[in-house]
Each structure stands twice: as structure tokens, then as C-alpha cells.
């Protein structure tokens, strides 16, 4: 597997790369092989090679809603951060997989295009956002998603239309079929820039007031259980401020777990499990994780 550097001398490849550099929690073990394609063609080459040689392949976006275990990830990590182009086509925006959702929302603002205001504070990449149908404050990616270019796990390039991109709460066809997002097309609407800015300012203020942005975190840890709010259940269970190792249930918003210093992925997972157990015993409600947990135990 280490011969990928010989096989693809034109592609940036690192061995035994610490993944804590790429996650918002600042935790995670090492990647055996860490690949950073600069073009869609390079990404396609690597995906096809991994499929042909039965090498495990993991896609890494912005690392924002993700916990990578302390034992790291075997096989190849494909990091799409260098695919960041954002372009306008009439009232549509085409953003590549590695583009930040926040930057895409800002681009829409600069172009006086409305529809992505809800995304102005979501820290993920376009690829990750499509994968989990990211959303906030009443908006979801699927509301404005028109089309996507993806790679299958065999390296086949596919164009998906809106009708093929089924989505629900924190779910998408892309996740179901394990597609690799290369770009996304969003259909937006012309609007006065000052009105778009006002909406973004309102949402940013709400986010800053409620969320613990001063600490590393993976964002909202749990999905919203039917008929409940995860943060309220955790708070009413007396868990706000609870600490395991360097991980803490946020004092600002109980739906977040923050790294208050030196946390490991194991600390995060132990605290998540403790929260789930406590809420289950107290309220008979099962908290399902929204954050994605991947990798191997140490």
C-alpha cells in the first residue's frame, strides 16, 4: 500500500499522518496513507486504484462533525480539501467538494443570491454537508441542492439530478450509497444583498449566543429525538458540565461536547456513551449520534 507514492508521483501523499490536525475536536490517531488530490481526475485515479487493489478507502472532508478513534484509520484517507472552487452560473452556484459551507454561503451573499443563509455558520465542507444533509435554523442543504457530481466506490463518475438526491433529516442518498461527492450545484434566488446580510447576521448572533464556539468540538453530537430536544434531555439529566478526561458536556449548550484540553477520542466516546446511558435510564429516550465516528480503537 505504501507504494502509492511511486504509483502516483504527481499526487500529494503522506504516510502515518496524524489526523488530529484535521478534526475540529483536535483528536484522532494516524492515517496509514493520506492522499490530497488537486483535481477530480486525481481523485478518480486513487479511488479506482483502491478498488482494484482492495485497499480500504475513507473520505475526509473538513473534519467538523467527526470523531476519529485514537487508533487511527487503516488503508487510504482521501482528503478533498484542495478541491475548493466556487463558481456562479446565473442563479446557480457550483461548489466543489472541499469548499467550506461557510465560504459558499458568503459567496452567495457577495453574488446577491439567497437560499444559503442558514449555512453561514455551519463549519463543514460541501461534501460532508451533502453526505449528512446538513442543516440549521430551519434550512437544509437538500432545500437548495439541484445536482451533484459523485464518484462511486469503483471510481465511476456519476451526475445525479435533484430527483435522484433523496434526503431526510441528517440522511441522504449519497450516504446510503457511499458516494464520494466531487461538486454540488445549488439553485438560489436573486435578493437584495442587505436583506441576505441581515438574515446572516441574525443567525450568526443566535449561533454565537447559544454555541460553545470558544472550544474545539464536533458540533451537535446527537440527532433530535422525536418529540424531544437532545440538549434539554441532557441538561435535565444533570449532565451539563460533566467531564470525562479532557471532554466536557458544554456549559453553554448541553448538546455539545467540547475539548477543554488534552481530550482524546476515547474521552469523547466514553462521555457520549455515559450521556446516552443516563438519558435512557432517566427518560427512556435513546439518543442517536449525529456525529460520525470512524477508525480503530487504540
Swiss-Prot record:
Matches recorded under Pfam families: FAD_binding_4 (PF01565), MurB_C (PF02873)
Keywords: Cell cycle, Cell division, Cell shape, Cell wall biogenesis/degradation, Cytoplasm, FAD, Flavoprotein, NADP, Oxidoreductase, Peptidoglycan synthesis
Protein purpose: Cell wall formation.
Transmembrane regions listed in the UniProt entry: none
Protein's recorded name: UDP-N-acetylenolpyruvoylglucosamine reductase
Statement: the UniProt record of this protein carries the keyword Cell division: yes
Recorded name of the encoding gene: murB
GO terms under cellular component: cytosol
GO biological process: one example: regulation of cell shape
SUPFAM superfamilies: FAD-binding/transporter-associated domain-like (SSF56176), Uridine diphospho-N-Acetylenolpyruvylglucosamine reductase, MurB, C-terminal domain (SSF56194)
Catalytic-site annotation from UniProt: 170, 220 (proton donor), 290
Subcellular location: Cytoplasm
Principal location listed in the UniProt entry: cytoplasm
Known cofactor(s): FAD
Homology family: Belongs to the MurB family.
Lineage: Bacteria, Bacillati, Bacillota, Bacilli, Bacillales
A single GO molecular function term of this UniProt record: UDP-N-acetylmuramate dehydrogenase activity
Catalytic activity: UDP-N-acetyl-alpha-D-muramate + NADP(+) = UDP-N-acetyl-3-O-(1-carboxyvinyl)-alpha-D-glucosamine + NADPH + H(+)
Top EC group: oxidoreductase
Pathway assignment: Cell wall biogenesis; peptidoglycan biosynthesis
EC number, as in UniProt: 1.3.1.98
Annotated PROSITE patterns: FAD_PCMH
